[in-house]
From Swiss-Prot:
PANTHER family: TRIFUNCTIONAL PURINE BIOSYNTHETIC PROTEIN ADENOSINE-3, TRIFUNCTIONAL PURINE BIOSYNTHETIC PROTEIN ADENOSINE-3-RELATED. Disulfide bonds: none annotated. It is found in: Plastid, Chloroplast; Mitochondrion. This is Phosphoribosylformylglycinamidine cyclo-ligase, chloroplastic/mitochondrial. Pathway: Purine metabolism; IMP biosynthesis via de novo pathway; 5-amino-1-(5-phospho-D-ribosyl)imidazole from N(2)-formyl-N(1)-(5-phospho-D-ribosyl)glycinamide: step 2/2. InterPro entries: PurM-like_C_dom, PurM-like_C_sf, PurM-like_N, PurM-like_N_sf, PurM_cligase. GO terms for molecular function: ATP binding; phosphoribosylamine-glycine ligase activity; phosphoribosylformylglycinamidine cyclo-ligase activity. It catalyses: 2-formamido-N(1)-(5-O-phospho-beta-D-ribosyl)acetamidine + ATP = 5-amino-1-(5-phospho-beta-D-ribosyl)imidazole + ADP + phosphate + H(+). The keyword Metal-binding does not apply. It comes from Vigna unguiculata.
Length: 388
């Protein structure tokens, strides 16, 4: 399936029109394709449309500290685009787009891995970037309680390096295995002159399914509910424009050791994004999960409020989880304010679940040795996210 058709699945499922492959793209090699020749549903109604951004709204810049804006990310332009799209596609804002199908919803999400790709080019680490690609979409759709069904990818480059492309696809296959979903198809586009030598771009689309009476939507969240955090592997796939700016300013190279650890900066920054699908679906099956947020672009500040109804806020307990060394280094080397860190990075928590107090006790008491769950906060009356 072409990228345009995949994006339509995620963003405009409601059109109830056939999704068609892009047959007019020059110098394009279709790896595999899927053609949907008729609408998936019957009523053409849209429940939710997803439009995710890798950027977040940033407050006033610190006088000396670096910000996402300093790194070249125009937050205001991104917010303005979302506002304009909202006029054409009411209902945007969820982590995944929902399309009714009988007694279930198809849930779709599409994403890329941002400028983490530039570190892949520099380090030569191409075999895990595909895991990042899958993770960004499947982690989004599982926030609705959806089980991923299939994934499609788009690989674009100026000149096809078969060995590199094979490594990338291997990572995508690994990510799909971790998600219990199928790599159903994709597109490989070779477009001379559009990319620099040795560079490529990636994007992907995941589609899952959830019963209508099992959708996780946050509507039942109340003050006093508990926020459980699932640890990240590091930076994951967001904020790399700022990461690269800090790296350049620090005078260190990717081969240097990460301060405060026994691994290199390359190893820390290229650690693949955690895929939370199996873990989250298992927790959902045991009951008490009311809302889920994937902590991506926008960090804690912008993502957590997407989960609960108006009139409620989140109180996050400072020091309630272990912040990885890579974030401590980024903040110190870039002189980044606390508020900027929280709006840009996951700070060591890649997924949060809002659960009832009873479910929280069960989750924390019965976790296995391999499980790391943190009670990181609670739901309170108010708005936004407060740290204390």
């Amino acid at each position: 399936m072409s990228l345009s058709a995949c994006a339509e699945l995620s963003r405009c499922f409601a059109a109830a029109a056939s999704a068609k492959p892009n047959s007019g793209k020059s110098n394009s090699t279709a790896a595999t394709s899927l053609v949907i020749s008729s609408p998936i549903g019957h009523d053409g109604a849209v429940s939710s449309v997803s439009r995710s951004r890798k950027t977040s709204r940033i407050v006033a810049e610190a006088s000396q500290g670096l910000t996402y804006r300093d790194a070249g990310v125009d937050i205001d332009a991104g917010a303005e685009l979302v506002r304009r799209i909202a006029k054409m596609a009411p209902g945007i804002g969820g982590f995944g787009g929902l399309y009714p199908l009988g007694d279930s919803y198809l849930v779709a999400g599409t994403d890329g891995v941002g400028t983490k790709l530039m570190l892949a080019f520099e380090t030569g680490i191409h075999d895990t970037i595909g895991i990042d690609l899958v993770a960004m979409s499947v982690n989004d759709i599982v926030t609705s309680g959806a089980k991923p069904l299939f994934f499609l990818d788009y690989f674009a480059t100026g000149r096809l390096d078969v060995d590199v492309a094979e490594k990338v696809v291997k990572g995508i296959v690994d990510g799909c295995k971790q998600s219990d979903c199928v790599l159903l198809g994709g597109e490989t586009a070779e477009m001379p002159g559009l990319y620099k030598e040795g560079e490529y771009d990636l994007s992907g689309c995941a589609v899952g399914i959830v019963k209508k009476d099992s959708v996780i939507n946050g509507k039942n969240i109340v003050a006093g509910d508990v926020i459980i955090g699932l640890p990240s592997s590091g930076v994951h796939s967001n904020g790399f424009s700022l990461v690269r700016r800090v790296l350049a300013q620090s005078g260190l190279s990717l081969k240097d050791q990460l301060p405060g650890s026994n691994i290199t900066l390359a190893e820390a920054l290229m650690a693949p994004t955690v895929i939370y699908v199996k873990q989250v679906l298992d927790l959902i099956s045991k009951g008490g999960v009311k809302g889920i947020a994937h902590i991506t672009g926008g960090g804690f500040t912008d993502n957590i409020p997407r989960v609960f109804p108006e009139g409620l806020g989140a109180l996050i307990y400072d020091g309630s989880w272990e912040v990885p060394a890579v974030f401590r280094w980024l903040q110190e080397a870039g002189k980044i304010e606390d508020s900027e860190m929280r709006r840009t990075f996951n700070m060591g928590i890649g997924m949060i679940l809002v659960v009832s107090p009873e479910a929280a006790n069960r989750i924390l008491e019965n976790k296995g040795q391999a499980d790391k769950f943190y009670r990181i906060g609670e739901i309170i009356s108010g708005n936004g996210v407060t740290f204390s």
